[in-house]
């Protein structure tokens, strides 16, 4: 502010000087602000989005790999390679024969006519030709109940998910039982998605289906692969005493990896409690579980899992290779060789498991109607006695 008692000339001089100084200060501050803003933008501005080409390039060997001659040693996922190039060769242990044969096509035709939804086809199971390829009375099919939408989202599974799936069809137990009784199979597996939206997790629906199958065709052996019912042991009891022959519930993986592999609502100990309760509810039941290998588990972790299973009296265990359904799912850490699967089969049998199926392409319902299990079940029904177990 210019003092009022100064002469007009001096006031004018001071006024112009003040304005020039103010402009200089503003200019200096503006430049400093611009420089600071530019520096901050440079620090926080994200890099240009990588192109598909860059992503693909980064998956392969680096420049140093080519210089050192190690480019040929860079691992390429055989399943990913096969998806991109149909001519790419898979390891021999991941190859399966093309489904064919009179029995296979007969079972497939029956599935269509009876309007049954089988996991065998929908999940593109690699063992379908084995399970459907023999005599119809020896064939095994896995029927999906309670819809095709799960309320959980495990990182290995490609089944559709939703918090509010469609309500169960009240006629499904009757229709399924009627269809299966007319089919002529000797062994059937019923499975289901997790239904956390239902008060009992769908236990009553499954139990009613089993009861009606046994009513219409008592000779059919029934296995149910169920969920954990959120740990509700009452729901477990409902299913265990429904008349089924094999109660299956999958652990999927070892305890340390469970939080990373399965939905957060599924816990290792909760699954063990379900298998244990099923045996307590009906001691004559065969209890069964399945483990996938290839998530990065260690031998000691697998051994501890087998000890835990034997500790609760689990009778049957299967081992199979985890295969990534899509790029949105967990990566495969290791493709386990067939020799390792043979090793775990021997270990499990020595620990006292009644039956073990182990191989890269084995799934939880693989050859569920194996003659050995059928014989054990039929002997129990006639009170001939249980098959001996190894100590």
Curated annotation (Swiss-Prot):
The keyword Iron-sulfur appears for this protein: yes
| InterPro entries in alphabetical order | Aldolase_TIM, Elp3/MiaA/NifB-like_rSAM, LIAS_N, Lipoyl_synth, rSAM
Tell me the NCBIfam families matching this sequence: lipA, PRK05481.1, PRK12928.1
Q: What is this protein called?
A: Lipoyl synthase, mitochondrial
Keyword vocabulary terms for this entry = 4Fe-4S, Iron, Iron-sulfur, Metal-binding, Mitochondrion, S-adenosyl-L-methionine, Transferase, Transit peptide
Residues that hold [4Fe-4S] cluster 1 according to the record: 120, 125, 131, 365
Q: Which cofactor does it need?
A: [4Fe-4S] cluster
Q: List the GO cellular component terms.
A: mitochondrion
Q: Which Enzyme Commission number(s) are on file for it?
A: 2.8.1.8
**What does the record's cofactor remark say about binding?**
Binds 2 [4Fe-4S] clusters per subunit. One cluster is coordinated with 3 cysteines and an exchangeable S-adenosyl-L-methionine.
Q: Where in the cell is it found?
A: Mitochondrion
């Amino acid at each position: 502010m210019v003092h009022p008692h100064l002469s007009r000339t001096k006031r004018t001089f001071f006024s112009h000087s003040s304005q020039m100084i103010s402009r200089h200060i503003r200019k200096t501050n503006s430049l400093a602000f611009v420089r600071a803003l530019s520096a901050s933008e440079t620090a926080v501005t994200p890099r240009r989005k990588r192109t598909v080409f860059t992503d693909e390039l980064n998956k392969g060997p680096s420049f140093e790999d080519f210089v050192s001659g190690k480019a040929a040693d860079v691992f390429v996922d055989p399943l990913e390679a096969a998806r991109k190039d149909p001519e790419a060769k898979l390891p021999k242990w991941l190859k399966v024969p093309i489904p064919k044969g009179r029995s296979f096509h007969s079972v497939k035709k029956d599935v269509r006519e009876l309007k049954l939804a089988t996991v065998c086809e929908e999940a593109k199971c690699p063992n379908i030709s084995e399970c459907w390829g023999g005599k119809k009375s020896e064939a095994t099919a896995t029927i999906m109940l309670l819809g095709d939408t799960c309320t959980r989202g495990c990182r290995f599974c490609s089944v559709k998910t939703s918090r509010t799936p469609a309500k169960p069809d009240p006629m499904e137990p009757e229709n399924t039982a009627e269809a299966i009784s007319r089919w002529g199979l000797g062994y059937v597996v019923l499975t289901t998605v997790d239904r956390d939206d239902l008060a009992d997790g769908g236990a009553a629906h499954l139990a009613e289906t089993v009861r009606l199958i046994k009513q219409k065709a008592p000779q059919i052996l029934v296995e149910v692969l169920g969920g954990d019912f959120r740990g509700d042991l009452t729901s477990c009891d409902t299913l265990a005493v429904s008349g089924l022959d094999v109660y299956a519930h999958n652990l999927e993986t070892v305890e340390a990896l469970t939080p990373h592999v399965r939905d957060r609502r599924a816990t290792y100990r909760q699954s063990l409690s379900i298998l244990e309760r099923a045996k307590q509810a009906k001691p004559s039941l065969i209890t069964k579980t399945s483990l996938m290998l290839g998530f990065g588990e260690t031998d000691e972790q697998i051994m501890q899992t087998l000890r835990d299973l034997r500790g609760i009296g689990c009778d049957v265990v299967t081992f199979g290779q985890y295969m990534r359904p899509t790029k949105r799912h967990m990566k495969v850490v290791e493709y386990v060789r067939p020799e390792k699967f043979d090793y775990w089969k021997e270990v499990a049998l020595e620990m006292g498991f009644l039956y073990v199926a182990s191989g890269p392409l084995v799934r939880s319902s693989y050859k569920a109607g194996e003659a050995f299990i059928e014989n054990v079940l039929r002997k129990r029904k006639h009170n001939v006695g249980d098959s001996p177990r190894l100590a």
